[in-house]
Structure formats: structure tokens, C-alpha cells
Amino acid sequence: MITFKTVKVCLLLIFVFVNIFYIAPCYSLVLREDLFKNALDLSSDGKFNLALQEWNRYLDAYPDDAAGLSNRGNVRLVIGDVEGSIDDQNKAISLNPSEIDPYINRGICEEALGLWSQAKKDYQFVISQDSKNFSALYNLANVEGSISQWEKARELFSKAALYNPGFAMARSSMALA
């Protein structure tokens, strides 16, 4: 005999299963996107200390998000935590080795520390994946100039300007090299 209590328990179980397998994942996805967007907006707005807090909060919940790690690494670089930035870029690369942005970001950190050969290696990797990546070409040109390889620097600045004609820094750097 089915009692009201049995029906109530069955409905409660159905509600719990629907919540666990349907509603909760949807809410989680929205929450994840909101956390990421908020941290990215704070970063873009130049509110770096707040952005770092938000990236930390995001990465506490989603520690295997390579894009989140790379973005937090960029914020860490801006606030002067170069080694922390390199750690984040290394983690991002280990999670998604085919994504090129963390290599560029790590190269910028290595330049800041005067680690020219490591920076050069990162930029060359990016160029091997995308020969028209003007950012990698420009940064590699900076490295070549830093080690007094002016002809190579000039050639790379020229390529960076060619692949992104609106990139005024590449043109002015080419003239100075």
C-alpha cells in the first residue's frame, strides 16, 4: 500500500536527483563564467590587487584552468611577483601545452629577470607554431637587441610590423635597432 509518506519520500528523492544532475551543474557553469569574467574585468580595468584576489578565488574553485592560471600570472607580473607569474605560466603550459599565450607571458617574465636564453626559447617556440605571431616576433626582437644582435632585432621588428601594420612600437623599435 502506497502511503502519503512514501510518495513524499519519492518526490523528495526525485527533487534531490534533479537538483544534483541537472540544476547544480548549470548553476556551477554560470558561477564559473561569472567568476572568470569578474576577475578578467578587474584585470582589464587595472585593479590588479582586487583582480589577484578574484583570480585566487577562481583558481581555488577551478585549479586546473590553464587560462585562469595564465591570466593570474599576468596580474602577478604587473604587481611585481615575477617568480609567481612564471609559476602560473608553467602550470598553464603543463595543463595545455598547445596554447601559446602562456609561452609569451613566461617569456616576458624571463626578460624581466634578464633570462635572455629562456625568453628566446619561449618566443621561438611560439613562432614555430605561428610564424606570423607579431607579439612573439616583437618580444624576440627585444631579446636580440638586449644581447646586442641588432641585425636580427631589426629583421624581427620588421616582421612584427609587417604582420600587424598598426603596431607602432614595432616600427619605432625597428628604426632604433
Each language-model region and where it sits:
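Helix-start (N-cap) detector for alpha-helical repeat units in TPR-like alpha-solenoids
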Residues: 32, 66-67, 100-101, 134-135, ...
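Register position in tetratricopeptide repeats
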Residues: 44-45, 78, 112, 146-147
